[in-house]
């Protein structure tokens, strides 16, 4: 089921906040009011996951400059996130909140639960300030994601929101031309 253009479902969960070195409660309301990225991954203390989360951290300042809140989610507890943060060179760099979803509520809400394994799939969601999903990417376990591509998708989503009636073509980058769909473009692209 596609979540594109659908509002996120309610949830309440515990997260580890590395910036403050504390546990905190988060809900769907924390993903509203500004742009948000939710990055699901299978498990702490694993292999591809730390490379993805470190890559996401490497883009964190750019995401903050774009006004984007970043959250990672796995079916581990927030306690395990803290332990991983304290023991992994890659994960110790993370500044964004790490949500624990042992009940699998959020993972199910975003339709990324691998039922057989009981783990989250590799899913990334861009959520607008209204709490509506604007983009989604889901990869197989062995395929890591590229956070620089994510940054460009966010820029495109923000551009389209700020410029109604315009769309971003393939390979669009900030500053390049957008399209205005209409009869004058039919068959000319």
Curated annotation (Swiss-Prot):
Q: Which keywords appear in this protein's UniProt record, sorted alphabetically?
A: Antioxidant, Cytoplasm, Disulfide bond, Oxidoreductase, Peroxidase, Redox-active center
| Major localization listed first in the record, in broad terms | cytoplasm
User: Which is an annotated GO molecular function term of this record?
Assistant: NADH-dependent peroxiredoxin activity
GO terms for cellular component: cytosol
Q: What residues make up the catalytic site?
A: 49 (cysteine sulfenic acid (-soh) intermediate)
Alphabetical list of Pfam families matching this protein: 1-cysPrx_C, AhpC-TSA
Q: Which processes are annotated in GO (biological process)?
A: cell redox homeostasis; cellular response to stress; hydrogen peroxide catabolic process; response to oxidative stress
Give compartment(s). Cytoplasm
Domain of life, per lineage: Bacteria
Which family is it part of? Belongs to the peroxiredoxin family. AhpC/Prx1 subfamily.
Protein's name in the database:
Alkyl hydroperoxide reductase C
């Amino acid at each position: 089921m596609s979540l594109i253009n659908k509002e996120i479902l309610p949830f309440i969960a515990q997260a580890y906040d590395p910036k403050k070195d504390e546990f905190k409660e988060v809900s769907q309301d924390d993903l509203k009011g500004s742009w948000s990225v939710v990055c699901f991954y299978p498990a702490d203390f694993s292999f591809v996951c730390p490379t993805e989360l470190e890559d996401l951290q490497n883009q964190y300042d750019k995401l903050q400059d774009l006004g984007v809140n970043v959250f990672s989610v796995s079916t581990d507890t927030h306690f395990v996130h803290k332990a991983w943060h304290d023991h992994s060179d890659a994960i110790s760099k993370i500044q964004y909140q790490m949500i624990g979803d042992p009940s699998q509520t959020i993972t199910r809400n975003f339709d990324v639960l691998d039922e057989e394994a009981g783990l989250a799939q590799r899913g990334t969601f861009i959520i607008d300030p209204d709490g509506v999903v604007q983009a989604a990417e889901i990869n197989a376990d062995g395929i890591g994601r590229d956070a620089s591509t994510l940054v460009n998708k966010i820029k495109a989503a923000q551009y389209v929101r700020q410029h109604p009636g315009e769309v971003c073509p393939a390979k669009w980058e900030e500053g390049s031309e957008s399209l205005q769909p209409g009869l004058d473009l039919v068959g000319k692209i």
